[in-house]
């Protein structure tokens, strides 16, 4: 009984991909990868399974979201929860030589366990890049520009890249509230975009009115109305001021790339990915309630694999990108040749000719079809080679 109950069910958060959606994903994937490769990024693959003690613990994904299993030797493995940590492992162990930046790209599925069915997938496809070994703001600008170019090649026209600096937020919070525990509470409000809760929490803190005002002023440092001078005046530490300088330099570089029209600065931007150390960014598109992609600088991650190197990168959620594109569920154009036994050779030759022309062609024996009317609705056009005459 239990076996029959789950016969057509899938594990929580898992999805099937039907032909029409697969075709859309393939087109989007190919367009993005072609663009990424023109920037000199090289595609790599990493294993679906990684050791929990290395990649699993280094990943910024919460432990309860990891799919865990044991191998034959009793080692705990995880299905990769993101691609940044596996690529950091690979770069640190096999590829990176100090002073020689790496430009790597990937197209892979990642896995994150869901506690309940809420419409969020437990497996999804990501396309992204990692620039490893280059600590300059120019590298951040390049990564963001690659992402924008790839999204445009995929067909996305209306989107916004929101850019911030986690170093700025951390510097401001630590100099006012004094310790990481209190700062993490404030960051959580910002990550959840719970600005009402943030304001109420700030007002409840035992701080001077001046410091409370500084924390509240942070919420106004975004969009076209803010200036970098305002951001710099709000923070006192050198680390915070350097973060503002980084963003100024980044803005100038993005203007040179000609992509500043889709970029906006938001000094409140934080991420749930704990390994980010500097500039970070998210991509938002119309009609999609979540970021379709994100990225940033993670200069301390490779150090966890015993190889110190700066790095920056991005990842795009293909499922959310397709939602943003609003692609119609049109099936790909596939022709069909329906033939009878006496015209089998003729049908094979015709199909071969059409395929040489780049067309997609199904070859179907008439005896294998039960309902010709229903079958014919799947293909266009259909060529019939039956008996001694040909109908179209």
UniProtKB/Swiss-Prot annotation:
Keyword set includes Amino-acid biosynthesis: yes
Location in the cell: Cytoplasm
PROSITE patterns, per the entry: AA_TRNA_LIGASE_II
Domain of life: Bacteria
Pathway listed: Amino-acid biosynthesis; L-histidine biosynthesis; L-histidine from 5-phospho-alpha-D-ribose 1-diphosphate: step 1/9
GO BP field: histidyl-tRNA aminoacylation; L-histidine biosynthetic process
Keywords: Amino-acid biosynthesis, Cytoplasm, Histidine biosynthesis
InterPro entries: aa-tRNA-synth_II, aa-tRNA-synth_II/BPL/LPL, HisRS-like_core, HisRS/HisZ, HisZ, HisZ-C
Molecular function as annotated in GO: catalytic activity, acting on a protein; histidine-tRNA ligase activity; transferase activity
Subunit structure of this chain's protein: Heteromultimer composed of HisG and HisZ subunits.
Family in the record: Belongs to the class-II aminoacyl-tRNA synthetase family. HisZ subfamily.
Protein name: ATP phosphoribosyltransferase regulatory subunit
Organism: Geobacillus sp. (strain WCH70)
């Amino acid at each position: 009984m239990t076996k029959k109950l789950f016969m057509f069910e899938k594990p929580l958060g898992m999805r099937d991909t039907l032909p029409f959606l697969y075709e859309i994903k393939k087109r989007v994937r190919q367009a993005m990868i072609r663009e990424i490769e023109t920037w000199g990024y090289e595609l790599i693959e990493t294993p679906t399974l990684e050791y929990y003690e290395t990649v699993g613990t280094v990943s910024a994904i919460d432990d309860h979201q990891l799919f865990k299993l044991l191998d034959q030797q009793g080692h705990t493995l995880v299905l990769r929860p993101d691609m940044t940590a596996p690529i950091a492992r690979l770069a640190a162990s096999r590829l990176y030589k100090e002073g020689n930046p790496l430009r790597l790209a990937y197209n892979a599925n990642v896995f994150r366990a869901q506690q309940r069915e809420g419409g969020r997938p437990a497996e999804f496809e990501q396309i992204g890049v990692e620039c490893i070994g280059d600590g300059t703001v120019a590298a951040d600008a390049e990564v963001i520009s690659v992402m924008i170019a790839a999204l445009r090649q995929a067909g996305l026209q209306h989107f916004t890249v929101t850019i911030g600096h986690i170093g700025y937020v951390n510097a401001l919070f630590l100099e006012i509230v004094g310790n990481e525990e209190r700062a993490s509470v404030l960051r959580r409000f910002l990550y959840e975009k719970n600005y009402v809760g943030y304001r109420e929490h700030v007002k409840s803190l035992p701080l001077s009115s001046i410091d409370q005002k500084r924390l509240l002023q942070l919420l106004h440092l975004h969009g076209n109305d803010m200036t970098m001078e305002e951001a710099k005046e709000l923070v006192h530490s050198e680390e915070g001021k350097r973060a503002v300088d980084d963003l100024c330099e980044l803005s100038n570089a993005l203007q040179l790339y000609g992509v500043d029209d889709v970029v906006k600065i938001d000094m409140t931007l934080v991420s749930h990915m704990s390994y980010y150390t500097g500039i970070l960014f998210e991509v938002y598109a119309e009609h999609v309630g979540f970021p379709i992609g994100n990225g940033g600088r993670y200069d301390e991650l490779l150090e966890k694999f015993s190889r110190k190197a700066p790095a920056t990168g991005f990842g795009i959620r293909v499922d959310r990108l397709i939602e943003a594109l609003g692609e119609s569920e049109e099936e790909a154009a596939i022709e069909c040749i329906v033939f009878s036994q006496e015209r089998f050779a003729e049908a094979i030759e015709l199909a071969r000719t059409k395929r040489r022309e780049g067309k997609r062609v199904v070859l179907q024996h008439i005896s294998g079809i039960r309902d010709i009317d229903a079958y014919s609705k799947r293909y266009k056009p259909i060529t019939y080679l039956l008996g001694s005459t040909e109908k179209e």
